[in-house]
């Protein structure tokens, strides 16, 4: 007979997992699949196999959602599901409405980041609660920023944290920090190390003595983002703020622009600007002022959504100014 303690623990686990009416229906079907008696042996085999497949798929889903519970200190970033049309092998049930997914091909859609399986029509009603599974997120570079931090359950991308820690531990006095380029082949090695080993990647001085390789890897990460750190949607607001002459109005508009960024992007930008502010405190040694860093990071963090090359070219000076303002006013804006 189970103890009172183990029983209360199981009740807590159930409360964590069963968050919706639909999931309650799934649990009922799961219990039926795992424990019901089905009469004759022949009919048992006929009905048992699809139920067993369903039980496995639903149990996997429930376990995944329970184990991916985020640490309370980690912000709960919203992320939309990355649904793609999918052909399922064998019987499958929708994880939203718990109804059978009929058809032989393209029975529904599957989230490429977390593996959620739903009807195409149900996908429009699924909340923005995608919790990417590491088995679906194969790389670090060129991966959507919010997808990466939710998959690894971190506040910021590991690349940003690890590179900045390494740079601040041994490179703040390096002349031309971020302006001087490192050897491109070694920068590519760092990229592959992060894609292969994640947070276990070795970027220490024993592996890469030249700090410019680490700064190059950090800049490459931001350049490779499919959605820039300062997103396409927020881009016009930042450019407009840079054009304002009045300093107070300019900072107020810039603050409003920051609020339009996705939370994971805003947190990463805040952390980066705080780091670049510390870089400017060593300007006598590294010769990198906020203006110089703006020239380097402007085009790296911001990409114009306009296809017109002339319009994008005209924005370069404002991109530089945006980053310069963010660095100088980091303690006020964030």
UniProtKB/Swiss-Prot annotation:
Assigned keywords, A-Z: GTPase activation, Metal-binding, Neurogenesis, Phosphoprotein, Zinc, Zinc-finger
Pfam family, one: C1_1
Record PTM text: Phosphorylated. Phosphorylation is EPHA4 kinase activity-dependent.
GO BP annotations, alphabetical order: ephrin receptor signaling pathway; motor neuron axon guidance; regulation of axonogenesis
Single GO term (MF): GTPase activator activity
CDD domains the UniProt entry points to: RhoGAP_chimaerin (cd04372)
Tissue spec: In neurons in brain regions that are involved in learning and memory processes.
Residue ranges of the region described as Disordered: 1-22
Annotated SUPFAM superfamilies: Cysteine-rich domain, GTPase activation domain, GAP
Zinc finger (Phorbol-ester/DAG-type) stretch: 80-130
Rho-GAP domain mapped to chain residues: 143-334
Role description: GTPase-activating protein for p21-rac and a phorbol ester receptor. Involved in the assembly of neuronal locomotor circuits as a direct effector of EPHA4 in axon guidance.
Protein name: N-chimaerin
Organism: Rattus norvegicus (Rat)
